[in-house]
Amino acid sequence: MGKTYSSPVNPIPKAPKGLAIHHWLNFLQAAYRLQPGPSEFDFHQLRKFLKLAIKTPVWLNPINYSVLARLIPKNYPGRVHEIVAILIQETPAREAPPSAPPADDPQKPPPYPEHAQVEPQCLPVLHPHGAPATHRPWQMKDLQAIKQEVSSSAPGSPQFMQTVRLAVQQFDPTAKDLHDLLQYLCSSLVASLHHQQLETLIAQAETQGITGYNPLAGPLRVQANNPNQQGLRREYQNLWLSAFSALPGNTKDPTWAAILQGPEEPFCSFVERLNVALDNGLPEGTPKDPILRSLAYSNANKECQKLLQARGQTNSPLGEMLRACQTWTPRDKNKILMIQPKKTPPPNQPCFRCGQAGHWSRDCKQPRPPPGPCPLCQDPAHWKQDCPQLKADTKGSEDLLLDLPCEASHVRERKNLLRGGGLTSPRTILPLIPLSQQRQPILHVQVSFSNTSPVGVQALLDTGADITVLPAYLCPPDSNLQDTTVLGAGGPSTSKFKILPRPVHIHLPFRKQPVTLTSCLIDTNDQWTILGRDALQQCQSSLYLADQPSSVLPVQTPKLIGLEHLPPPPEVSQFPLNRSASRP
C-alpha cells in the first residue's frame, strides 16, 4: 500500500536545503494556482525533485524553467509537471519591460522610457533635489567616524543602535551597503549571528507580504538595491536594524558588572561610570534603572554602603542615593612614619677575628679559625668536619667483591608483593664479604698511618669487637701508646693491649677509599689483627654466608641402640676475642 499524506498543518511548506527563499516562493505561488489545489504529496514530490535538480550543472540563477522541465522524469508522481509549466508561462511576462509608470511618480505622463536593468548597487544612495537617485562611494572618514562612535558600545546596545540608526537615516544605504557596514563595525561572529537573524526576519516578512514586493522579481535583498525602490529599501533597513535586538549573549556582557567604586572616588563619579557602561553593554529595550540602582549599592565602597544602610536607602531611587552620599568626602589619611631602631655606629677598634676596623666581630665575614689541628690529618688550617679524608668519593660506584646469581623473575615478583606491591627504595649497591662455614672470616687488608706506606696483613672480621686491634709491629716507632683496660671473654686485661690515639687508614679490597679510624688498640704480643665494628660500620658492607650442599652421612644398623655408631661431632674453634675497650 502507498503512503497516506494528510492535509498540511503548516500552509507554507519548508524550502529544500540549498534553495533560495525567493525561488521557493515562486514555486509555491505556481503550485497554489493549480485547480484543484495542491496536496501535501505534491509538495513532497516537488521538494524531492528540487533536491536532485540543485545538484545538476543546469541549475542556474535565474532559473531556466524550460531546461528544468526537461529534467523531470516521465510519469513522475505528483503534479510537478503542472507547477513548472505555470512558471514557464509566467517567465516572458516577468522579463518584459514595465509598461506603466513607477509608483513613486504617478503624475509623469507617457511615453515612459524603458528602464535598463540596473546592476545591484553597493554604495549609499543620494537623493539630490530635482534629480534621480544616485550612488556615491563610501568615504573613509564617514566609516571611521561611525566606528569611533560605537567602538566603546556593544552591538545592540542603545548607544550603538542610536548611532547606526542615525547613519542609516542620513546615508539611506542599500542592502549591500548595510552588509559592508556590518563587516566593518562588528566581528565575524557577530556578523554571522546577525546574518542568521536577518534571514529569519526576511523570510517572515516575505511570507506575510510587503508593499511593493514582487516575489517573481527576486529576493528582497536584490530589490532593495534598486535606487528607485525607496519603500522596499526602507523595509529592508528596518529589518536589518531589528536583527541587532535579537542577538544572543548581549545581556551577559560582564564589563559593566566589574566596575567598582574607588576608596577615594566620589559617589557621583562612580554612578556616572556605571551609567555609561550600562548604555554601552545592555541591549536595546532592557530596563536599565533596576540594574543601575542595584550596582550603585553593591559595587560602592564600604563607607558609602554604611551611609546608605544607616539611612535605609539601599534600594531607593537613584536621586535619593546621590543626595545621601553627596556630603561624603574621602577621609584624609595621615602618613605615619615607621620608627626604626638606630643602628649602632661601627667601632674604631679592629675586629678580634680578622683584625680590620669598621665592623664588629659578630658581623665579620671571615670564618672562625679552628681551635687546633685536625685530629685526623693534623692540619691546623681546617676543622675536623671539613677534613678531606672524611669526604667519601661519591662519583664512582664501588665494585662488588662477589657476583651472586640473580633470582628468578617469579621469586622476585613474589617478594615484591610481600614487601608492598613492588614499591622499592632507591637502589644501593653494598659490597659483599663472603664467609665460609669451614674457615674463620679472614680478609686481606692494607694498613697505613700518616706518612707511611700501606702494609698488607690478614685481618679477622669480628662483629662482636667494639674497636679494631692491630699488631704492634705495624705501629710507627714515634707512636705514643696509652694504657687501657680491655674487657674480653677471658676477663679484664690491663697489660696486653695499648690504645693508639692516632689516625689509621685501612685499605679494603672492595673499597676505593680507605677506612679512617681516629684510634685503635695495639696488641703488644703481635698476635691479633681484628677488624671491629668501628671499621665495619664505615664499610657499609654485607656479610654473605654461602649455603653448603647437604651431605648424607652413611648410617649402619647399630647393634646397640645408642649414639656409639655416629661419628664424633666436629670441633669448631671459638673466636679468640670478644672484648670492649674503654677509652681514656
Curated annotation (Swiss-Prot):
A motif (PTAP/PSAP motif) lies at residues 98-101. InterPro entries: Aspartic_peptidase_AS, D_retro_matrix, Gag_p24_C, Peptidase_A2_cat, Peptidase_aspartic_dom_sf, Primate_lentivir_Gag_pol-like, Retropepsins, Retrov_capsid_C. Residues 93-117, 564-584 are annotated as: Disordered. A lipid is attached at residue 2 (N-myristoyl glycine). Keywords: Aspartyl protease, Capsid protein, Eukaryotic host gene expression shutoff by virus, Eukaryotic host translation shutoff by virus, Host gene expression shutoff by virus, Host-virus interaction, Hydrolase, Lipoprotein, Metal-binding, Myristate, Protease, Repeat, Viral nucleoprotein, Virion, Zinc, Zinc-finger. Residues 457-535 form the Peptidase A2 domain. Residues 98-113 have a biased composition (Pro residues). It comes from the Viruses. Residues 575-584 have a biased composition (Polar residues). Interacts with human TSG101. This interaction is essential for budding and release of viral particles. Late-budding domains (L domains) are short sequence motifs essential for viral particle release. They can occur individually or in close proximity within structural proteins. They interacts with sorting cellular proteins of the multivesicular body (MVB) pathway. Most of these proteins are class E vacuolar protein sorting factors belonging to ESCRT-I, ESCRT-II or ESCRT-III complexes. The capsid protein N-terminus seems to be involved in Gag-Gag interactions. Matrix protein p19 targets Gag, Gag-Pro and Gag-Pro-Pol polyproteins to the plasma membrane via a multipartite membrane binding signal, that includes its myristoylated N-terminus. Also mediates nuclear localization of the preintegration complex. Capsid protein p24 forms the conical core of the virus that encapsulates the genomic RNA-nucleocapsid complex. This is Gag-Pro polyprotein.
